[in-house]
Swiss-Prot record:
GO molecular function annotation: GTP binding; microtubule nucleator activity
Name this polypeptide is given: Tubulin gamma chain
Function description: Tubulin is the major constituent of microtubules. The gamma chain is found at microtubule organizing centers (MTOC) such as the spindle poles or the centrosome, suggesting that it is involved in the minus-end nucleation of microtubule assembly.
Organism expressing this protein natively: Entamoeba histolytica (strain ATCC 30459 / HM-1:IMSS / ABRM)
Example GO BP: cytoplasmic microtubule organization
Family stated for the protein in its record: Belongs to the tubulin family.
GO terms under cellular component: centrosome; cytoplasm; gamma-tubulin ring complex; microtubule; nucleus; spindle
Binding site for GTP: 139-145
Subcellular compartments: Cytoplasm, Cytoskeleton, Microtubule organizing center, Centrosome; Nucleus
């Protein structure tokens, strides 16, 4: 019995990414832009995870598209996919957007009741909801601010369902000058409201695009295409189920053993055009490529960290014997360094592939990993925030919405610092006795709010 997942695409980046993801999985399930099927051929899949059938038998995505600026939503509604989405699930903006400010996005309250109503309606359409996917950027105003508000609402209203975020971050040369403010405030919600967060970094995606496709300057389409390939592989076992990790819950139990250190890195190989000819590769080659720093979709000091957990997903013409042999060689050679307290840190999964999609290679692989080096990424964001906040620059919209009280910044900073510390402690054998200061800090904040 499939368990459904509702996808929320928030902000410009989130809607562009969500659109590419659905195009990708539509091709795998034989769903055309109007929601009809491209073939009557039987496919042993679970379309119901991300789609439902309307009265006219068309497949409609369990997708909610939200933005405070009309451009991206209008481009979707006027494209060849205009009849694919449920028109009632578009949140049409009535103002000029969030102005790249987290505070403006977070305090845009006039749309929250409409958003909540749409989410409730989609939940009612599900027989057994497993969770929510959340696509957004943490740097702009809508994806970060309004996105944070929506995450809080989902976490409070549906605490038993998994909230997984696909978060695009910018650490180097951000286009949005207040990105450090937006990022630190959003990281707080990603820590406290989500059960897992898959991190994507624009600079890493641009480098991968240049290396794999020879593109001098990566476009949004190029980067979203890479992310959607990863998301497709991530969800393959949910949509084409096998015997292992065919639910979000089973996967998260392995990847995120701690409540708050749930930030995941990903890589995908090979990223080649369909018409490119590639040499025959092996499972061990795929496993080695997946952990190469240049293939990870977030730039961290990977060699200075340790893996808390990892899961390799194989697709294509590869046997279980070859996969198990590759796993044995991988562990015997100690090709990756793991934390000392997790003896079951690495898992491998063979996922089925759609018979409708032409493949340009014998096999492909996708990595999902929880690595302690992510703390260095957060440290860089924290450093950028401190440099700006100490100067008290670009605070106009935040000062207005926060009424000159910047406690929100201070609390967010402390929560991020707690997670950085937790990832550092996770590298030692004493981690099992760790006291988790973030729990104490969050309880303190809760008591203060009750007192108010």
């Amino acid at each position: 019995m499939p368990r459904e997942i509702i996808t929320l695409n928030v902000g410009q980046c989130g809607n562009q990414l969500g659109s590419e993801f659905f195009k990708k999985i539509c091709s795998e399930h034989g769903i055309l832009p109007d929601g009809s099927l491209s073939t009557n051929e039987f496919i042993d899949d679970r379309k119901d995870v991300f789609f439902y059938q309307a009265d006219d038998q068309r497949y409609v995505p369990r997708s909610i598209n939200i933005d405070l600026e009309p451009r991206v939503l209008d481009s979707i509604r006027t494209s060849e996919w205009s009849n694919f989405y449920n028109p009632e699930n578009f949140i049409i903006p009535t103002n000029n957007g969030a102005g790249n400010s987290w505070a403006n996005g977070y305090y845009t309250t006039e749309k929250m009741s409409e958003i909540e109503e749409i989410i409730d309606r989609e939940v009612e359409h599900c027989d057994s909801l497993e969770g929510f996917f959340f696509c957004h950027s943490i740097c702009g105003g809508t994806g970060s601010g309004l996105g944070s508000k929506i995450m809080e609402m989902i976490s409070e209203k549906y605490p038993k369902n998994i909230l997984t975020s696909f978060s695009v971050m910018v650490k180097e040369n951000p286009d949005v000058v207040v990105s450090p403010y937006n990022s630190i405030l959003t990281l707080r919600r990603l820590i406290t409201e989500c059960q897992s967060v898959v991190v994507f970094d624009n600079s890493a995606l641009a480098d991968i695009t240049h290396t794999q496709f020879g593109v001098d300057e990566a476009t949004v389409f190029d980067m979203n295409s890479i992310i959607s390939s990863s998301m497709s592989a991530f969800t393959a076992n949910l949509r084409f189920p096998s015997t292992l990790y065919n639910s979000l819950n089973s996967l998260m139990i392995h990847l995120c053993p701690s409540r708050f250190s749930h930030f995941l890195m990903t890589s995908y190989t090979p990223l080649r055009q369909v018409n490119q000819i590639s040499s025959r590769t092996s499972a061990i080659d795929v496993m080695k490529r997946l952990i190469q720093p240049q293939n990870i979709m977030a730039r961290t000091r990977l060699k200075e960290g340790k893996y808390i957990s990892m899961c390799d997903f194989f697709q294509g013409d590869v046997s279980y014997d070859e996969i198990n042999e590759a796993l044995q060689r991988f562990t015997d050679r100690r090709l990756a360094e793991f934390v000392p307290w997790n003896k079951e840190a690495i898992k491998v999964v063979h996922t089925r592939v759609s018979p409708l999609v032409k493949r340009g290679n014998r096999m492909s692989g996708m990595l999902l990993a929880n690595n302690t080096s992510i703390r260095y990424y957060f440290q860089d964001i924290l450093k950028a925030f401190d440099q700006m906040f100490k100067k008290r620059v670009y605070l106009e919209s935040y000062r207005e919405q926060f009424h000159d009280n910047f406690q929100e910044f201070e609390e967010s900073k402390e929560i991020v610092k707690c997670v950085i510390e937790e990832y550092a402690k996770a590298e030692s054998i004493e981690y099992s006795d760790y006291s988790y200061p973030i729990h104490k800090y969050l309880k303190g904040i809760a008591k203060e709010k009750i007192a108010e």
